[in-house]
UniProtKB/Swiss-Prot annotation:
Belongs to the herpesviridae major capsid protein family. The keyword Glycosyltransferase does not apply. It comes from Gallid herpesvirus 2 (strain Chicken/Md5/ATCC VR-987) (GaHV-2). It comes from the Viruses. Keywords: Capsid protein, Host nucleus, T=16 icosahedral capsid protein, Virion. This is Major capsid protein. Self-assembles to form an icosahedral capsid with a T=16 symmetry, about 200 nm in diameter, and consisting of 150 hexons and 12 pentons (total of 162 capsomers). Hexons form the edges and faces of the capsid and are each composed of six MCP molecules. In contrast, one penton is found at each of the 12 vertices. Eleven of the pentons are MCP pentamers, while the last vertex is occupied by the portal complex. The keyword Plastid does not apply. The gene is MCP. Its main location: virion.
Amino acid sequence: MAGCHCPPAGDCPPVAPCTFSTPFNIGATLAPTGRLLSTIEMSSHRCMFDYFKQFSSDDNGRYAAQFDLLLGTYCNTLSLIRFLETGLSVACVCTRAPDLMYMREGTVQFEIQQPMIAREGPHPADQPIHTYMVKRLCRRSLSAAFVVAAEALALLSEVSLDGTAISTHLRMRAIQQLARNVRTILDSFERGTVDQMLRILLEKAPPAPLLIPLSRSQAEGRIAGQVMRANLVSELKRTVRTESFIMNKTNANRDTIISFLTKMVNCTHQTISMPRLTHSDSKGRLVDGVLVTTTMVRQKLLSGILDVVDTSARVPVTYGEMIISGTNLVTAVVMGKAVRNMDDIARYILNLKEDNIIDRTDEIVRGDDDRPQTAEISAELVTIGDKLIFLESMERRVYQATQVQYPLIGHVDLTFIMPLGIYQKRGDRYARHIGDYAPGPGCNVGDIRIFPPREIYFYNKDNQVISLSLSDAIGTLCHSSFLDVEATVGNLRNGKYTLSCVLGAYVTNPPALPLADASRQFFENIGEFLRDPPRWIDECHMTVEQFLSTGNPYLSMELHPAFDFFVVPGDVDLPGPHNVPQVMASISASLRVCNCNIPLPLCNSDFRDALGQELASTHHKMSDATINAVSATFSDISYPTAFYIIEAVIHGSERNFGLLMRLVIQCIRSYWDNCKRVAFVNNFHMVAFIDTYLCSGELPEECTNVYKDLMHHVRALRSIVRNYTVQTDPLYGQSHEELNHVLIDRTILPPLLWDCDPLIYQAEGMRDRDLYLNVGSENNYAVRPWLELQDADFQRTGNVLIHNRPIRDADRQTFVPHHAQEWTTLSKIYYYVMVPSFSRGQCCTMGIRFDNIYATSQSVIIPDLQPDEEPPLGPEDPRHPLNGRNLVPNTFNVMLHNARISVDADALLTLQETVNNMAERTTAILYGSTPDIGSSSSSTRHMRTFDGALHHGLLMMAYPCNDETVAAGTYFYPVPVNALFACHDHLAAVRDLPGNSRTLLYRAPPVPPFLGANYYSTFRQPVAQYVKESRCGPNEISYALMAGYFKLSPIGLYHQLRTGLHPGIAFTVIRQDRFLADMGLFAERASESYFLGQVSVTKRPHAGGVQFSLTQPRANVDLGVGYTATCTPLLLRNAITDMGNTVQSLHLTRGSPPLLHQEADEFLRKVTTRGQRAAPQRTVPFLGTLMPNLPSGLEHGQMSICEFIPTPVSADLEYFRTPCNPRGRAAGAIHSGEEASDIDDVMYDHQQGDPAYPFRATNNPWASQRLSYADKLYNGVYNLSGASPLFSPTYKFFTPAEVCCKTRCLDKLIGEAGSALASFASDGEVQFKRPIGSTELTEDPCSLFQEAYPILCATDKALLRAYSTGTTDNPETHLAQYLIRDASPIGGCLPIC
């Protein structure tokens, strides 16, 4: 055996003498060719394996010591072999540092000379500037381990050898297994070196979409200042959207991709190191950097995009120096004696004799200035711009078959936004050609595309058209959190307010006065209630833009779609005293009850009209003749006052109607013959009686058809409630129709009562609703069955109500309703729907002076006729009661004659029969109740509504200004019960009002506070304003009003959403999807210095053997004066989530105070979770579930959750066509100034404009304001379970801490980049690392920019499919339907985009 005993290098640990076998004692020829690295590697492997073969000893300690030393040296030698063959080594300056493990910390100082430009002119001469930069070394390490079993250890040390061939074979197997383990360890170090350096470069590589505009702005000097930052951020957003996944985009051709790659490789800074150990092509041109990416991207780049200029590269085969200054002095002094090249490795570590090291053609130059050895390897060198780039992909070479994910394959989370249910402005509802999408044959409802949209269609990841509809929002709206406003009210009460107008916000008891005096007293003292114009009046006259502008002082009170927040006298229980107490102002909240009370700018007249048109298209419509006749009647200022008197005499009594039937027939016929108008249409009882008794031939057919049509339409309106209510069992004795619609609710009275039927049914339907009822200034009421002449007291006050005389004598002794409950329901529909549809607000409820009514109605002149005389045929006959001879002043004959109404003597005689069933006064009724069981929670249980009604009152149509009897208030006086019946013209009947009072009364509907107030009324100003400004006819308005009276409660909304009725609330749909992306990393040449320490081997006992652990300390330091590396997502692989329509259900994720009635709460929880794909199979805990339930199988990927943010239907649709904040207002530090409060002000101070849309404060006041409905729903500050990143994609947009954290990351990065070229003190430390949070720019840009991206969607499939077919000039609008184009980073990347 020949021995080799060469002394080790001075900087290497001593190596024990070892013996090599003859075949391996001389290294193979090492030449500066492509075989150099592989030859070194093969020689090292053979030396190591030869050691295993020739080792023989029975001393375990000797074995262990020599093996540890040789193993460490072996791995230290070859750990860089693979690394030097990769393109990553272009970005590194590798330095061997044996003493690295003893270094506690290390810093390196660089001197940088700033370039100058000599200039002419009077400029002062510039002086050379030298900048000193101090950088800190980052300590790292690599570790690996393996175990040698005790049996193998015995075989290796020959302790267990027995001299047989089997034992020899087993020993050889043990040696081979150990060699495999060692090879695996070496392989892990080789792969680990690549992985570690790749991650080091990624740590210092800001995303290219960010760095490209930053470098451009820096070059132009546009970094400092808030304005410049805003411009920069705007460019950043555009870059992220347009240049992410550039290689997928259908509109990106070869030139576009090359242009982007050129910007990418030019946005980094060159390093301060100019090493001679660097890479070059085969012709000697230096490589400028390395572009590391995935195999897929590499193949695509090489397939016609980039041109390969060379297929081989010369790489250094040496440990390099960090700073070159003629010699290796710095490295030698700081790190010990340098190992410059592989010759030193062969000499010092492998113990190969110098004579046998290399058969070279070049002379070996000794000394510190030796020319570095290079080797030629296969490579793909491409030119990008003017740079030579090493194109590298290590996905298969290094990471394949390992359990480590390739760092350049990452995920990207994108949040998408879709508007659902929004109704466009009138100017945007157009069609380029009405026949583009025409309704099919047989469609008798017209083009349904003119109606408000209820669905949004889009594509999932597998190109299937799916949709979301309004019913999918059940899990959000139909939850008890919809009623939780305690925190909102508490926050509002922290402010300071002035109580300048209490009208509409204050309710009193009716005073103990006659109603005429009480109403007049209010009119005269209106100044105490109406010092300034009421807020609720001003809001109704605002446009959408005005309402959402910063100039709207009331915007801060619009926080919830179902609640009004308003200023009230503090600590005053309602109904309060007649004189408003002088107390501090406070804030109160009231339930809006029904969706028609949403402020008109947020649920505009156009939408309500369209909803009415949609319902009218499939239900009964009144004929044009009916509409013309009734509309003309309601606007007839010459409508006979005698008809009002007859109506008062009948006062809703079916018995009296039967007595006066002849008179009624003649009045109707005469009025119809005179002007083709219909009488008594202001009174439901009269219309119903006429339809029942007089439509069988007694009247002209055309006239009869009007009354029939009216009643038919009333019943059709009633069927709307039935059609849009899910049929199910009653709750707590209340039908679901009653819980769904206000007019079916028994606690709501008609505005005019002619008997006590509504009060009887109200008492039956109260349940736990805490009824408040004040009649004639006294609590509750007493009943008088009927009144005869001798018992009448027309000045009576108090709470006694007359129930009217029943028709059947058997019912005279019992207090029972005259009609079924449905009669009362139809009565409410007639007054609250039909009358406003025709009157358009030009009517008023009136009190009746029955003493004058009866005096006039009984003042009838009837000539005597002999029994054998023929009755007179007309007024020309002197015997006719309307002949001029019989027209005595102040008689009823005169009133009929003046109105050209022809009646005979027999008809007039019937008036005398009414004295046995009289009315004596009009009584004011103030009633109130707490919410029904569908909307009763801990927050709303004490919220009352207060409404007014008149018992034995009358509805006067257009004010008969030419009739002096009415103008003088002889028979009637105005008592408005709510805004629908409060026409100012009728105040002329109140004589001698002060001029100032009359002026003030015109500012708002003059509803006395003892009959309710706007904010406490069931029917508020928005619905009254709507009927005045609607452009539709009575058919459409009636259906729109009927749709507006559906309740805003969780149970009511469940019925509406489930059956497809638009609730007057739109939604912003938010969905977050995850995508798999291929990244590209570019690093400048020699941008990082990489230090490698000595591998240390430790062993410790292990179960059944010995474990060897190898650890190599390493360190790195950045060599740049700026960012020397950048990365970007180049290719979108696929979507991990399904991009689907799985909807959120708050019942599954959110604990919230339940409804007060357990039966209602259980019903709501049951029906809203039914059919949910993520619904649990067991009872949901009170605080929600920890994790959502998963389905048994998945087809399209992980389910992405859609969440719904309630949004006004009149919200600007253009807002959703570009990236926007789902809250409706921009947020984040990137928009704010330098003050500490600026971030909070940007989010919540709506006196400042939205930074993204300065002309308005917000696009959604229900989400953007502090403690608004959506803010409380999704802000993590208020919710611990539901609003969390685990469940909610909206969490990051609503939680202030999350918003501040994410956006400050971008602000910090901009600040650091802006100061990259500033001078640094010698004692400072600068490390250009990827700032914390900049990863979000590629992985979650939406949280960084606080914006969600519009995705391709449309409310009509035809629009969506026409766009998807790729035809040119696709429309974005067709009538009320709209299409949203994809404005996200994945736009054009997937087939659907």
